[in-house]
From Swiss-Prot:
It holds the Pfam family Complex1_LYR. GO terms for cellular component: mitochondrial inner membrane; mitochondrion; respiratory chain complex I. Belongs to the complex I LYR family. The modification Phosphoserine is found at residue 85. This is NADH dehydrogenase [ubiquinone] 1 beta subcomplex subunit 9. The keyword Acetylation applies. It is a peripheral membrane protein. It is linked to Mitochondrial complex I deficiency, nuclear type 24: A form of mitochondrial complex I deficiency, the most common biochemical signature of mitochondrial disorders, a group of highly heterogeneous conditions characterized by defective oxidative phosphorylation, which collectively affects 1 in 5-10000 live births. Clinical disorders have variable severity, ranging from lethal neonatal disease to adult-onset neurodegenerative disorders. One of its GO terms (biological process) is aerobic respiration.
Length: 179
């Protein structure tokens, strides 16, 4: 089980949140009628909220252990897994058919002429990437602590007024929005 591998490195709060989410997902598999599911989800939420402000960490850890054992005995034998999730029927199914972007550079000009708008826009993006790459790398280095990231949180996607980085979908999270 993948979620147990990172267990020692998670905070107590993260463990509780992940247990709660797993329990809700398995409850969804047990209760197919939405109203019945909602009723039992509210009961489960009340059980979690009952011990939300527990100050004694020994007791909180014991409660978490008991809750994980209860989850183990009550989990659904065949839980619903979303098709594109790991373990789902379509997980990474079409990744083998995705062609890397650099392959488009090798297209013959007659092939590129069939899609003039796309390739004109693509050339603009390539030019923008060449012009802004150094600035984007500098921004990423400025926002990352010297010893590397200390948490899983990544730097924001961009600063106010900057163009969106071209690598945002790989290494960043969305920029914070004030509440």
């Amino acid at each position: 089980m993948a979620f147990l591998a990172s267990g020692p490195y998670l905070t107590h709060q993260q463990k509780v949140l992940r247990l709660y989410k797993r329990a809700l997902r398995h409850l969804e598999s047990w209760c197919v009628q939405r109203d019945k599911y909602r009723y039992f989800a509210c009961l489960m939420r009340a059980r979690f909220e009952e011990h939300k402000n527990e100050k004694d960490m020994a007791k909180a850890t014991q409660l978490l252990k008991e809750a994980e054992e209860e989850f183990w005995y009550r989990q659904h034998p065949q839980p619903y897994i979303f098709p594109d999730s790991p373990g789902g029927t379509s997980y990474e199914r079409y990744d083998c058919y995705k062609v890397p972007e650099w392959c488009l550079d090798d297209w013959h000009p007659s092939e590129k002429a069939m899609y003039p708008d796309y390739f004109a826009k693509r050339e603009q993006w390539k030019k923008l990437r060449r012009e802004s790459w150094e600035r984007e790398v500098k921004q990423l280095q400025e926002e990352t602590p010297p010893g590397g990231p200390l948490t899983e949180a990544l730097p924001p996607a961009r600063k106010e007024g900057d163009l969106p980085p071209l690598w945002w979908y790989i290494v960043t999270r969305p920029r914070e929005r004030p509440m």
